[in-house]
From Swiss-Prot:
This is Cytochrome b. The gene is MT-CYB. Heme b b562 binds at residues 83, 182. InterPro entries: Cyt_b/b6_C, Cyt_b/b6_C_sf, Cyt_b/b6_N, Cytb/b6-like_sf, Cytochrome_b, Cytochrome_b_C_euk/bac, Cytochrome_b_N_euk/bac, Di-haem_cyt_TM. It is a multi-pass membrane protein.
Amino acid sequence: MTNIRKVHPLAKIINSSLIDLPTPSNISAWWNFGSLLAACLALQILTGLFLAMHYTSDTTTAFSSVTHICRDVNYGWIIRYMHANGASMFFICLYMHVGRGLYYGSYTLTETWNIGIILLFTIMATAFMGYVLPWGQMSFWGATVITNLLSAVPYIGTNLVEWIWGGFSVDKATLTRFFAFHFILPFMASALVMVHLLFLHETGSNNPSGISSDSDKIPFHPYYTIKDILGTLLLILTLMLLVMFSPDLLGDPDNYIPANPLSTPPHIKPEWYFLFAYAILRSIPNKLGGVLALLLSILILAIIPLLHTSKQRGMMFRPISQCLFWLLVADLLTLTWIGGQPVEHPFITIGQLASILYFTILLVFMPIAGIIENNILKW
């Protein structure tokens, strides 16, 4: 008798994606982050749903409702901190996942890569709007500063900002719409994840060697299900250590002060996972230039497949490109540090140099390294 999972219309789809999926036999732990991201998204939707049951998106009660969740709701504090720190874990996994794609040349699967970039933007937008919801000082001023950047758009800028605000400043209308979008975007992200997987399973996964693995595939279950479960357990362990021992480690103390439009915090900065982009934005003195650099810092990923000059797919056997890749990682860490520093000497100069280096590595050095490595192969 044929197994039901292979004939049932719905089970058949799940079976071909998670059970009988032919998978390269040599994929390393770097390939775990896809499933970890799925776990993070599920966790965020679940904890977010419970928070939404108690949250009120009104400027007068938003801050109090978050306090109420932490003090009065059964296990509300753990749900709130799992949601807040879950976002940090989400972004750690996201950046690892993108980094893996860059290192091993997974961007050659262009449809999967491009859907991934759209997903990245969706999740970044969700996280930004979520940061506004507690209506603390950093929520309010972060929303004001970031939405104000749209005023740099020529001709329609001011109208665009006021349209997004729903008034002449960040106020009740802004908070309500941000809550609505923050609620719906993760579900849109879930749909995009399905499309991401659809395109991935059309071609099959890449692997560390970068060569075709068609001749050596193994079923996803049990080999990679058990590996993914181990990864998920480690993720949950890390998250719970963070939640239980230092839940506010990655947050901003200013967000425990209720939003006050009349008092500007000394240093307005976003959550740590946006600091690298914020540093790039701040490193350009011109407003429009800064906004474009901010967008390009992520959009640059879309042209990476066009800049691939090497005859080899991944960087596993390309030492020059490897050095450049880790230089890029160090540069991004430097930008993250600079984004959290005040705008004064020497941080301004370091930020500008790090921003120039970021674009130069991706646009100039890496393609040149690929050509050099091709020539070395001829010797």
